[in-house]
């Protein structure tokens, strides 16, 4: 049954990825699958969280890629899934770059699709652009409109390029739009057109493929889209051909012992990690639908699955400012006000750091303030 395949694939991912890191394989999608499945392993999630903090601090910016904001969106999805706060990752707010709609859409339709998904995972407020910015402020309406405007003429659906609906991009767009399906007639009509366009491409074996090859990832994204729309990927007649459902088609790529193949090569299947992660979170999405839970990306039910490290916070890269005013040394200790910032986050004395003054009594000395991370 799909449940057994799901259980063993969760274990396969956990055993294969000993430590998840920021990345499109072995990273956020694996974390998403395990976290939304309800797999408990605080050490594993904590290692991932600490890796994200290190990664962001090494870049030294809240923009994880110079141009593509899908990196930010993907990490926001991973962090939210484990109950972490994407607005303070080692002192950086990963939501902030998504406030600039021009930057979000720079890479094409993928940008707004994943920005909308990421923002909705935690129902996050979109940060405001600075007053002096000439860029377009991102809003949910703006993201939805951008996606709707990119719908293909004719039969509908979406694609990165060309005039034929692409299964992956179309079903990803549907996943982004799904929360607005019932409330917005324009969204509903576009989603219905897209889901029909993709159904028309489904092959006799129930399979789906971008670029003419049936592959498990295209099936996986379609299953996620159907689950988000509260439609059953195993019985929904629009997605059953010759008694083969889209779920059957994806499960045909399963490999005993856990794991999924990308596509059959010379009739043989071999485990592919990206395919395994996508198929597994698609099964999580399907299982959540079957058991009446919130959708894969509606994380209003999230729990904190990791533990914040008890190790001391390093403040060596923090900016320490001492209020500068003429102090006259008269034999009593002087303690000017001190501000400590990490990235763009103001740190709190007694929570993040302690301070100690030295040489601050007698004139002629160089007074010093020492900030120590807690």
Language-model features, listed with the residues they occupy:
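An alpha-helical repeat/solenoid feature that recognizes helix-turn-helix modules
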Residues: 16-42, 62-87, 104-140, 152-192, ...
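Core helices of alpha-solenoid repeat scaffolds
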Residues: 49, 91-95, 140, 144, ...
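Serine/threonine-rich, repeat-prone extracellular segments and beta-strand-based repeat modules
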Residues: 342-374
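Terminal, non-catalytic domain-edge segments
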Residues: 1-8, 249, 262-311
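Solvent-exposed, low-complexity, repeat-rich "mucin-like" stalks and linkers
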Residues: 310-345
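Surface-exposed, proline-enriched loop/turn segments that connect beta strands in immunoglobulin-like
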Residues: 211, 321-324, 357
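Fold-core signature of tandem repeat domains
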Residues: 158, 208, 329, 338-340, ...
């Amino acid at each position: 049954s799909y449940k057994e395949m799901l259980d063993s694939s969760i274990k396969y991912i956990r055993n294969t990825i000993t430590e998840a890191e920021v990345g499109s394989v072995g990273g956020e999608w694996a974390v998403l699958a395990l976290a939304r499945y309800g797999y408990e392993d605080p050490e594993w999630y904590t290692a991932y969280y600490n890796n994200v903090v290190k990664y962001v601090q090494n870049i030294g910016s809240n923009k994880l890629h110079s141009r593509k904001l899908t990196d930010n969106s993907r990490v926001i999805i991973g962090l939210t899934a484990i109950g972490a706060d994407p607005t303070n990752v080692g002192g950086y707010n990963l939501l902030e770059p998504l406030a600039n709609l021009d930057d979000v859409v720079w890479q094409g339709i993928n940008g707004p699709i994943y920005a909308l998904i990421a923002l909705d995972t935690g129902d996050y407020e979109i940060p405001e652009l600075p007053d002096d910015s000439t860029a377009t402020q991102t809003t949910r309406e703006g993201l939805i409109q951008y996606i709707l405007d990119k719908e293909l003429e004719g039969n509908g659906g979406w694609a990165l390029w060309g005039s034929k609906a692409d299964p992956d991009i179309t079903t990803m767009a549907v996943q982004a739009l799904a929360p607005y399906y019932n409330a917005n007639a324009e969204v509903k009509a576009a989603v219905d057109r897209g889901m029909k366009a993709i159904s028309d491409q489904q092959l006799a074996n129930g399979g789906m493929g971008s670029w003419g090859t049936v592959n498990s990832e295209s099936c996986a994204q379609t299953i996620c889209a159907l689950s988000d729309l509260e439609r059953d990927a195993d019985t929904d007649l629009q997605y059953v051909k010759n008694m083969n459902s889209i779920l059957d088609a994806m499960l045909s790529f399963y490999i005993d012992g856990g794991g999924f193949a990308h596509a059959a090569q010379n009739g043989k299947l071999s485990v592919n990690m990206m395919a395994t992660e996508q198929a597994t979170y698609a099964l999580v999405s399907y299982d959540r639908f079957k058991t009446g839970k919130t959708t894969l990306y509606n994380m209003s039910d999230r729990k904190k699955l990791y533990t914040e490290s008890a190790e001391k916070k390093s403040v060596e890269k923090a900016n320490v400012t001492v209020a500068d005013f003429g102090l006259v040394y008269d034999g009593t200790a002087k303690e000017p006000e001190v501000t400590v910032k990490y990235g763009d986050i103001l740190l709190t004395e007694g929570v993040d750091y302690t301070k100690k003054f030295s040489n601050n009594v007698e004139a002629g000395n160089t007074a010093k303030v020492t900030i120590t991370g807690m």
